Amino acid sequence: MDFAVPLLLDAGEHLLIDIFGNGERERAYDFLITAWSRGTGQYGYANHWVACIEEQIVGIISSWHDKLPGQFDRDTLTSITDFYGLDEAIDVVMRSQTYTIALNPPLVLELAIGHLAVAAGARRNGIATSLVRFKERMAREMGKLSVVLDVHTGNKRAIDFYQAIGFKPRQEIPPFMQMTKGVAPLG
C-alpha cells in the first residue's frame, strides 16, 4: 500500500484530487488509502495489478469491461459513503459525475484500461508497456477484440506513449480523449 496508493493517485492526480479531495491532495490520498485497503470497488487492491522490482511496487494498472457485477458499483459507493459520510458522499458523487459524462464505458468486445502509472525512478524501462501488454493478453483471453482507454487531453506525454504502442484516437469529449487498439483474437 505504501507504494501502490501514491501510484494510483499519480495515475489521475488532477481528477482524483478534484473528485475525492475537493481540491485537497491529502484528503484524496486518505480516501484512496481507505478504498485500496477495502479491496473491493473501483479503487480497491483487488481491481488493480502491479509490477514489482525486487518486491517493490513500481507500476500499477486497472481494467474493467461491460459485464462488471452490480456489486462492483455498490462496493465503490460503499467505500465513498463509509469514508465521507452520506452528506459529503453525495457531493463526491456529484463531482464525479462532471467527469463521468465525458468518459465512455467499454463496449461488449472491449476491455478498458486505466489507473496506469509507473514510479518516477522506474520510468523508461518498459514497465508501462509491459503492463499494457499484460492487459492486451487478458483482453484476448476474455474474447475481446480491442483495448480502450480514456486519457486527459492535456496529458501529452501519456498520449504520445499510447500512440507509440499502437493506440489510435477514437473520439474526444473534453477533457478526455478515448483511444483504442485492436488485439488479435486467440487462435
Which residue ranges define each predicted feature?
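Conserved acetyl-CoA-binding loop-helix of GNAT-fold acetyltransferases
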Residues: 115, 124-138, 160-164
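Conserved GNAT-fold acetyl-CoA-binding loop/helix
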Residues: 12-36, 81-86
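Conserved acyl-donor/pantetheine-binding loop and adjacent beta-alpha core of acyl/acetyltransferases
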Residues: 67-110
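Conserved catalytic-core motifs of GNAT/GCN5-like acyltransferases
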Residues: 67-68, 150, 163, 168-180
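A short beta-loop-alpha structural element at the N-terminal edge
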Residues: 1-6, 13-18, 66
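Conserved beta-strand in the GNAT
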Residues: 50, 56-65, 112, 117
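Active-site rim helix/loop that mediates acceptor-substrate recognition in acyltransferases
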Residues: 25-48, 53-54, 101-102
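Conserved GNAT acetyl-CoA-binding A-motif
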Residues: 109-111, 139-152
